[in-house]
Design a protein with these regions (language model features):
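Charged docking surfaces used in two-component/phosphorelay signaling
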Residues: 64-72
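Detector for a conserved hydrophobic position within an alpha-helical segment of the HATPase_c
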Residues: 4-6
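Glycine-rich ATP-binding loops of the HATPase_c
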Residues: 9-15
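Alpha4 helix (beta4-alpha4-beta5 surface) of REC/receiver domains from two-component response regulators
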Residues: 108-119, 125, 130-151, 156-161
C-alpha cells in the first residue's frame, strides 16, 4: 500500500485510539483539468501483434488486471496461479513472453520459476513483475536473462512499453 501511495505522490494519515482502534486514511492528488484528448490509447501505448503472453501471479486480481490490460493491447493472454503451473504449461505449450510475479506464495517465486523455465526453454523471453523494490533475487533473475523488471501497479503505458521492448529484442 505504501508503495502505491508513494507512486501516486500521496500520503497516509493514521489516527489511533486505544478504545476505538486505528484509522488509516489514504490521500491521493487529483486534478480538476478536463481531459483534452479523446484517444482510447495515448501515443505512448504500443499495441501488440497478437503475440502470446503467459502471466504468472498467485493473486487472482493481479492476473485479471494484467490479462485485461494485455488483452486491450491486442495480446493473446494465458494466466496461471503459480510457478509450478507455469512450468507445466510451458512443457506443453510455447509462448512469446512470460510475465512472472516475483513474490508468490506458496511454492516457487519468480526467480525459481525462471530457473525451471530455462531448463526446458533456454531462450524463453521473460519479465519479472513486483510491487516491491528491486531485490537481489530480481537482480539475479535479470543476470540469468530476464529481460526487464516491471514495477507494479501496472499502468497501460508502462506495461505496453516494457512488453513491446522485450518482445522486440
Amino acid at each position: 500500500v505504501w508503495g502505491t501511495v508513494q507512486d501516486h505522490k500521496g500520503y497516509i494519515d493514521i489516527q489511533s485510539d486505544e478504545n476505538r482502534g486505528t484509522v488509516f486514511e489514504l490521500y491521493f492528488p487529483m486534478t480538476r483539468k478536463a481531459r483534452t484528448d479523446r484517444q482510447v490509447f495515448s501515443h505512448d501505448v504500443i499495441r501488440g501483434r497478437n503475440e502470446s503472453i503467459l502471466v504468472v501471479d498467485d493473486i487472482p486480481e493481479q492476473r485479471e488486471i494484467a490479462s485485461q490490460i494485455l488483452g486491450r493491447l491486442n495480446y493473446a493472454v494465458t494466466t496461471v496461479s503459480s510457478g509450478e503451473k507455469a512450468v507445466a504449461f510451458l512443457r506443453e505449450n510455447d509462448t512469446d513472453l512470460v510475465i512472472l510475479d516475483m513474490i508468490m506464495d506458496p511454492g516457487m517465486d519468480g526467480l525459481d520459476t525462471y530457473r525451471e523455465i530455462l531448463a526446458i526453454k533456454p531462450n524463453q523471453k521473460a519479465i519479472i513483475a513486483s510491487g516491491y523494490a528491486e531485490t537481489d533475487r530480481v537482480k539475479t533473475a535479470l543476470d540469468l536473462g530476464v529481460g526487464r523488471y516491471l514495477k507494479k501497479p501496472y499502468t497501460l503505458e508502462k506495461i505496453s512499453r516494457v512488453v513491446r521492448q522485450e518482445l522486440d529484442c
